[in-house]
């Protein structure tokens, strides 16, 4: 149950969203995907779900009862799909944290459902090479910053500290340049404009 906000006077405590971990990570082959990994992982070779779709709906409903939003960690496209399904069923909005690989249909669903995409551009630098190996068949659907903006999604840039450094200017640079070193831009068609990146960093 969320703290009551009905009592008068200043409050020194605020409640953030309910965080739900739906899958793992790409590098450990535990991000829950629609398609299998090259070497397989999990019962069907496509990663692992940390919570069932039914339990996810229950958790989001519990957040709704407590007047909380839900922030769901979803890196794989199957995980993101199940989170969007759960938001649709429960009728509340929240955010998907990471959203590293998405189907075309689900890119459009973010805006339709009012779901925020909370992404970390520096993960692109960390995962670029591994993505080309593990997700070579879907690399063009990874870190789809520009597609999400074009679809009307509320995009928020963050750091995911301490996994990546708290460096908003570095995140903005990667979001715009799609590289963190001297190599060419990685899928430059997904680059944000500087204005878009700054706006997303202020959310």
How should each PLM-predicted stretch be described?
Residues 1-77, 109-116, 121-122, 172:
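Metal-coordinating catalytic core of metallo-dependent amide/deamination hydrolases
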